Amino acid sequence: CYPENAPRYISDILTCSMTMYFQSRHEAGEQLAVQLFEKYRYENTAVVALSDGAVAVGEPIAAKLHCVLTMLVSEDVAIPGEGQSLGAVSQEGTFTYSSELEASEIREYNTEFHGYFEEKKREAFHKINNLIGDGGIIDHDMLRERTVILISDGLSDITPLDVALDFLKPVKLARLVIAAPVASVDVVDRVHMVADELHILDVKANYLGTDHYYEQNDLPTHEQTIAKINQIILNWR
């Protein structure tokens, strides 16, 4: 079930099913929950979603593990005319450059588009603050000494993981697990060294866009997702 050009280690570290398409993100999350339950049902665990769609995947996982579900909100900053991400702003206001870019590329883009990028960063941070308020919906204390499971509904781009890893740098974790129903070979190749464990149901050589792999794409709005996460955290505390 792995692409022919996938690195050899993929078959050793990933649990892959023959499923290429999922009925919904919830159903994909249930499949991941079965895998994660076997290893982490007795662990002190936190599930951290990386997007709205990831919350839908993460809900059945958190329910199965009886653990908190939260979300790391970030806003992407794109490079004009390139169809590529420069990086993303986190809820703390920190900007993380995409690890797909070389240092020389970053310098070149910053020289050419400095004013544009600074404005987009301010807009991104303002948008995040409007959504989640000053307190945010995730903090370091919530994750310290826990097994943290980073959840995505589809890993086609490394940037959300770059932001998450940057956010987690000052936090002492028990383990770091990255899980997703589907991921591109390129992303898996980049992240397998930073996680203690990966759980990916399907690895794609030619990633067609996350929505393509789900029959149902009727997600709540960003505002509804944030409200849901806030309620989950309040109930958990």
Language-model features, listed with the residues they occupy:
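PRPP-associated nucleotide enzymes
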Residues: 1-237
